[in-house]
Amino acid sequence: MREILFFGLLSICIFLVFFFYKQKENNIIYNRIVEKFEDNVVIDEIYTHLFKDSNLKELVFIKSQLIIPELEHKKMIKATGYRADAYKALSTVYRFDFKVHDNKILGFKSVIFEGFEDAKVSKHENNLPSEKWQQLKDFNIGDPNINEKFFHLEFPFVVKNTLCVTISKGFFKKIKKLKRLKIMLISNEDREYKIDIENFLPKYNL
């Protein structure tokens, strides 16, 4: 009986060591959030890659789905018009969030995906009306100077800066084919933050 118990505990320990090794190897934290309001549903799938040795702390990929049954039906029957067209453009949104820690508030004037240096980039605010999003070509990095009046300040604590980059469905399909994600962020101070990691996107049903 003791031998059975011993080997049972040993098997569990081996499994846990393997599990945590795989988690560390992949370095990806997955989270799924489902929110319902009336008959509508919002589903966020969130993939977080953690970095340890630089001011760039996290790369977060988010796939957001908005499901509105009434408009979902219209989309299926190929309806047109402002609401139907806006829903088609916004029902699934792909986004990267880059989290950079510093003692200053940062702006980011450029984002470069290696292999797609000629990508078409927009720089409008994320809260503009949906017709702007219908015109999204490759990706949007937001207004790099929105917090310009604070750029000169230095703080005695860590400032957690987040750069949100919304990407089009077409551009998402392109980067999903890459073996590695090589991305460079350039701040308002011309500091470069480089990412070179295995492309985890093809591993998931996105």
Swiss-Prot record:
**Gene Ontology CC terms, in alphabetical order:** cell outer membrane
Q: Which domain of life is it from?
A: Bacteria
Which compartments is it annotated to reside in?
Cell outer membrane
* Keywords of the record: Cell outer membrane, Membrane, Plasmid, Signal, Virulence
Q: Where is this chain primarily localised?
A: membrane
Query: Which segment of the chain is annotated as a signal peptide?
Result: 1-19
**One Pfam family for this entry, by name?**
BPTA
Keyword presence, Signal: yes
What's this protein's family per the entry?
A: Belongs to the BptA family.
- Describe the task this protein carries out: Virulence-associated protein essential for survival of the bacterium within the tick host and therefore within the natural life cycle of the Lyme disease spirochete.
By what name is this protein known?
Protein BptA
